[in-house]
């Protein structure tokens, strides 16, 4: 097997610069593209990209469907295959316009990287995600001990994730000063906070209970009064590793550094849920929990629009499509309730709440009309 192809490496380097500077992709997205292209090269034994043939694309698709995920030992998910094929297709589409490749690669040949239609439908299907209930989260929080500084941090981390609805990577990079307890607001400054698409965003605490808010408030007070941290220090600092009394490496406290990524947060969540004898729910699932809560609490389109914006979504449909799926058991409950409501109100008679809202609107409108005729 060929170990290196200098020509391929040069053009790949040029492509990655294009992705970063022209397409403005993140390092993570570029790494994913590089992984997919490397897999294609392995399939062709690192042959020159200029010698691309549609049979190579067909062979690559077959191999992706035959290979197993190294972590699970199961076949790759259709969604994973779709992403890898699209990454390689995008590369060859770009390559077809580059000097030295134009006459050898046609744009139409790139279409051979398309996934079969049935597989694409499987990859794009919306599946019911495991979502924790508010009660389950409360149970986990009550199960976490809060004796050591690390335990207090971990407990506050779960509480803050529910209170803020923020993504885990953004939380990992948040400073103490970004949280205003008096105004119940969070300033997600994209200059320092790793927000999605690096958007600066102001948000307000979600109405999840005074007890949740108290845990976060006590944690910030601990950071400032006991550890003497300032506003520029991390809200959730890294664990400090040192030697314990047995000269073994162990957690000995906290540093003044941020976590480099969100993996430590996910590990904390995993350990907390397992300790509470509950299945693991990742940090992002809390956003689904909050959306479900919003669907129950919000009574007007304007209220849910505000709820959606507080989740850093510019469009309400993003919240509905990605987070607003009604779980199966809840769907059954709603349908049963709707049926009973219909039976209780013959001849389409409106319920008392609807009547009250209509009367309030008519009264307000009458006052406006009255002023206009004076």
Regions found by a protein language model. Name each.
Residues 2-3, 336-374:
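C-terminal secondary-structure termini that scaffold catalytic or DNA-interacting sites
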Residues 13-28, 34-126, 143-146:
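N-terminal core-binding DNA-recognition domain of tyrosine recombinases/integrases
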Residues 30, 88, 157-158, 165, ...:
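Alpha-helix N-cap/helix-start motif at helix boundaries, enriched for small hydrophobics
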Residues 134-168:
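Basic, Lys/Arg- and aromatic-enriched nucleic-acid-binding interface segment
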Residues 173-217, 221-227, 231-233:
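Conserved tyrosine-mediated DNA breakage-rejoining catalytic core shared by Y-recombinases
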Residues 209-278:
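Active-site/catalytic core of tyrosine-dependent DNA strand-transfer enzymes
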Residues 255-309, 313-316:
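Short, basic (Lys/Arg/His-rich) helix/loop patches that form interaction surfaces
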Residues 311-337, 343:
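Catalytic-site neighborhood detector that most strongly recognizes the C-terminal catalytic loop/helix
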